[in-house]
Amino acid sequence: MPSGYVETSIISYLAARPSRDLIVAARQQLTHTWWRERRPLFDLYVSQVVLDEILAGDPDAAERRAVLASGIPLLDITPEVADLAAALIQRVPLPITAGADAAHIAAAACHGIEFLLTWNSTHIANAELRPRVERVCRESGYPAPVLCTPDELMGGEDE
């Protein structure tokens, strides 16, 4: 079964109230559809970075997010993950404020996760940054995960 790292934005979209913003509402619907129909086809993982992010903010929303993440195995944030995150910040480069985003990528890469599922197109699922992220991962000795959104992991017609 393919493996997937669930980044914070996925859990946040699942737990959020329906948005009035059309684009956000469409992403929420796609996320719910993926979670319902495709999630069983993947071994999913999160990291402590995800847990820290989902537990921040409004206590009621944080509880809804925590329930969704419960039972998803936790990847360790090892020294290798920290080193790769630092390399991504320095060599992609990513802004220092994108430390959590770099940690998501690094956790997935260091643990050999095939897909990183996210709605963060600023620093993660970004077509311009993707080749540089892949290069830094490869040069650091890790396979880069496929950085993608739920609609990119909906499967083919013959599935």
Each model region followed by its residue ranges:
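Active-site neighborhoods of divalent-metal-dependent phosphate/nucleic-acid chemistry enzymes
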Residues: 72-132, 154
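Short, C-terminally biased terminal segments at protein or domain edges
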Residues: 141-159
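C-terminal end-helix/capping segment
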Residues: 125-146
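Short secondary-structure boundary segments
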Residues: 8, 48, 119-121
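Short, well-structured N-terminal submotif of metal-dependent ribonuclease cores
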Residues: 1-46, 55-66, 72, 90-96, ...
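General small-molecule cofactor/ligand-binding pocket signal
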Residues: 45, 75, 146-148
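Residues at the C-termini of beta-strands that transition into short coil/loop
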Residues: 48, 78, 150-151
